[in-house]
Amino acid sequence: MDIYTASIPGCPWLGSKTIRHLLSVFKTGEKIWNATSEELCEKGKLTSKQLNSFLKYRKEADLEKIYKLMQNFNIKYCTLNDEVYPKLLANTINPPPVLYYRGKLPVTDRIISIVGIRKATVYGIKTAKEIAKELSERNVVIVSGGARGIDSAAHKGALEGKAATVTVAACGLDKTYPAENRNLFEKIIAHGGCIISEYAPGTPPLGRQFPARNRIIAGMTRGVIVIEAAEKSGSLITADFALEEGRDIFAVPGNIWAESSKGTNKLLKIGAFCCTSYEDILSEYGWENKKEIKCKKDKTFNKQLTLEEEVLYRFCSESVEITEDELLIKTGMSLKTLKSLLLQLQLKGVVIQTPSGGFIISG
């Protein structure tokens, strides 16, 4: 670990653009750290204010403490030149020069962010959770900000699916904000996802850092789904960043009388894509609408089901058999269609026929 590179973003008044320039001309964090004042001004193009801030920070910073924090919290970092740096984020207007992370960074470009209001309604929570779950089951990574309300619902929904989910924090990764989501964040990491931040370890969650955080949420994804947002919601800042980066904006329509839907309904009026189902996202990007099924014992079947097969599968149980007649009533399918789909489910090994003629999920 280059502790110098990992420590430099903690210096006040050195923004992303400045640090990117420093790394491009000095090549390593150690060379930046040990550069003379003249070199920092001439090659690094630091202003007098930035120079004084860096010299003070360099003198007072406890590198050993930062190193121990990163070790204790299993915090890694990458720079723009590293292979693991998220590709979509790297190609934005203002990418973080150093990205800290806990867990595993996503390697796919099938990434969608879901954002929304903290004081979400039951409708908003249910919608966020369901869309995230269905997308995750179809190998789409869900990114959000880890806040209360819509963000948390999106992460929880994604955890019920197959793909990873990513939280973008507005503080150092040794901090937990909000504290109530500590267990959720640990589940995200355990599920193969990660928590990322552009802020050095030790940085508290300050208000001004949340809008800056939102550009990462927008930048590392193909599109942003806004689910419930007031007229001046932070989620609309994320949508603005998405527009700047040429990302797609999707909005879920809401109650026209509710304050919590004024922002999303406004987005729809000015041209955002209307999103009423996970299928709207899959259709927009031409992503295959198939998923892996997890049974109640959490055994994953590597069998791809069509939508009709999936509907039928959901009416089956692991422990209680269901008859053909019962399935006809519950699904409303024709007998010919039902028999054909049952045969396909049996051939794929996810459903078996019992000696009495009923059907159960294979164990």
Task: Identify the role of each PLM range.
Residues 1-83, 251, 324, 348-350, ...:
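Short, small/acidic-rich helices and loops at N termini and domain boundaries
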